[in-house]
């Protein structure tokens, strides 16, 4: 009966979403077309002096990967102004990035979105870039009201609001790594493929915050173990953590547990129980976690944002992902770790389409075997 009501609610929500999007598109899918001067280089041919990136989803991992675009544009065109719409913890990832000139904080409140758009419109951006696979009504409104000279989006050839479009299955493939999609955007702008570096950037100003903490670690190697994913179903349980910790207790590897908010409280018993477990008591933002990862050797995580941070610093990674590539069958490819040494382990599938996966249902024996391979790879 519970699954029946879930099914009915999902059908209703999908129906209403489709209606809202149609109405929103009818209202906001409008733009006076700007003449595009065609050639081999959109930026130069159309005198692009400023670019606004829209990253209003608040996803940390996406922002990390997006950093390659900021850097590569600035590398060729250092005088171009790069603005960025962002929200939440994703702002922390780019707040010290020298390739971003201005950050605009996004709030979901409709009134604040309009105020933000009017502020941006005064800046008269030449080009707006949106990465959304599905545009919600508030996002359509934001793009419309920003008033950029050109708008570039994803699969938007049938939209009046967009002047340019990166096309899936033509400019990139859905099953390719996310960096290939961002490469397609850069090529659309006229950058040369052979000159583009697809690595990520994270800039950390305070490099000494954990010096004392790290100096107390007696083991010769350090492994960052991140328990947390996007939901409780995608987070490691205490039992899972203990299994990994116990397996590593005689391997001369320190385990650094990372967390957010008040999650420290549910982990501190592990530090008291195991001599190879260390928990810093002052993780206040994602850059703190990034610093700990940078100063470690290995990373194990069920969360893609941590995986992307580890990839930035080319750390050896074991990631635990849902089976079958997630909802669309390609997540494990699109969001794969990007270090020299990586391994993705899959948990078991959910029992029905209305249940949640449990990330803890991976095979422990497989995890142990992969940990040994990862450790040996670093010797």
Question: What residue ranges belong to the model's regions?
Answer:
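Catalytic machinery of carbohydrate-active enzymes
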Residues: 1-379
């Amino acid at each position: 009966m519970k699954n029946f009501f879930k099914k009915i609610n999902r059908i209703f929500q999908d129906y209403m979403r489709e209606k809202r999007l149609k109405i929103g598109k009818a209202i906001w899918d409008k733009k006076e077309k700007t003449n595009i001067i065609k050639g081999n280089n959109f930026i130069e041919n159309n005198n692009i002096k400023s670019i606004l990136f829209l990253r209003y989803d608040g996803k940390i991992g996406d922002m990390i990967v997006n950093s390659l675009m900021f850097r590569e544009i600035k590398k060729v065109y250092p005088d171009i102004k790069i603005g960025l719409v962002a929200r939440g913890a994703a702002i922390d990832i780019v707040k010290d990035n020298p390739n971003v000139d201005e950050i605009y904080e996004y709030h979901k409140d409709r009134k604040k979105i309009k105020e933000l758009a009017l502020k941006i419109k005064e800046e008269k951006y030449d080009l707006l870039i949106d990465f959304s696979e599905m545009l919600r009504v508030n996002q359509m409104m934001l793009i419309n009201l920003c008033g950029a000279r050109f708008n570039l989006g994803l699969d938007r050839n049938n939209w009046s609001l967009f002047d340019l479009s990166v096309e899936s299955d033509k400019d990139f493939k859905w099953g390719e790594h996310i960096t290939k999609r961002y490469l397609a955007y850069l090529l659309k702008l006229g950058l040369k493929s052979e000159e583009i570096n697809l690595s990520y950037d994270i800039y950390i100003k305070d490099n000494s915050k954990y010096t004392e903490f790290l100096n107390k670690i007696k083991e010769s190697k350090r492994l960052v173990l991140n328990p947390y994913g996007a939901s409780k179903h995608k987070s490691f349980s205490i039992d899972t953590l203990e299994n990994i910790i116990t397996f590593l207790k005689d391997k001369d590897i320190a385990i650094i547990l990372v967390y957010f908010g008040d999650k420290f409280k549910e982990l501190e018993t592990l530090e008291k129980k195991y001599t190879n477990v260390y928990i810093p008591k002052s993780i206040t933002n994602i850059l703190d976690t990034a610093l700990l990862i940078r100063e470690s050797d290995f990373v194990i995580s069920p969360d893609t944002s941590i995986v992307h941070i580890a990839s930035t610093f080319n750390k050896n990674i074991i990631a635990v992902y849902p089976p079958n590539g997630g909802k669309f069958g390609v997540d494990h490819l699109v969001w794969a770790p990007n270090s020299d040494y990586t391994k993705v382990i899959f948990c078991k599938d959910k029992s029905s389409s209305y249940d949640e996966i449990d990330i803890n249902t991976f095979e422990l024996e497989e995890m142990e075997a992969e940990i040994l391979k990862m450790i040996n790879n670093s010797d």
